[in-house]
Curated annotation (Swiss-Prot):
Assembly notes: Forms oligomers.
UniProt keyword Repeat, yes or no: yes
Species this chain originates from: Salinispora tropica (strain ATCC BAA-916 / DSM 44818 / JCM 13857 / NBRC 105044 / CNB-440)
Family: Belongs to the MraZ family.
Protein name: Transcriptional regulator MraZ
Keywords: Cytoplasm, DNA-binding, Repeat, Transcription, Transcription regulation
Gene: mraZ
InterPro entries: MraZ, MraZ_C, MraZ_dom, MraZ_N, MraZ_sf, SpoVT-AbrB_dom, SpoVT-AbrB_sf
A Pfam family the protein falls into: MraZ
An example Gene Ontology molecular-function term: DNA-binding transcription factor activity
């Protein structure tokens, strides 16, 4: 399970050093793809395969599933982190998420998310008030 917030920097070659506490779970390989709210999702390869299986189970006649699959898979980049725990974020994904040098990497249970630091701070500011309101709908009785 991925938890926590980390603030690494992107190097000049577009590489990110994965947080140390995530490296063991990601050492076997990752898939980086477009996420919601203009962040990037980083999945361990087995988790990405699980999602791929779920999408494959959708009928080809399901228009929304086809559309989502196209974007999700077309933008995906698979890689094995190097010995220093680095992964390269391809240019098209850096552009999609508007990544600058300063990043925020968060644990989001089954995946890791990569955000531009300014975008993350803006997202938090906008969603903070909603957090308490949506809690009851997501986790009733918590």
């Amino acid at each position: 399970m991925f938890l926590g917030t980390h603030t690494p920097r992107l190097d000049d070659k577009g590489r990110l050093i994965l947080p140390a506490k995530f490296r063991d779970e990601l050492a076997g390989g990752v898939v980086i793809t477009k996420g919601q709210e203009r962040c990037l999702y980083v999945f361990p390869t087995p988790e990405f395969q699980h999602i791929a299986d779920q999408l494959r189970a959708q009928p080809m006649t399901h228009k929304a599933a086809r559309a989502y699959s196209r974007v999700f898979f077309a933008s995906a980049h698979d890689e094995v982190p190097d010995k220093q725990g680095r992964v390269t974020i391809p240019g098209h994904l850096r552009e999609y998420a508007a990544l600058d040098r300063d990043l925020v990497v968060i644990g989001a249970h089954t995946r890791v998310e990569i955000w531009d630091r300014v975008a993350w701070e803006s997202y938090l500011a906008e969603s903070e008030d909603e957090f308490a309101d949506i809690e009851e709908g997501v986790l009733p009785g918590l």
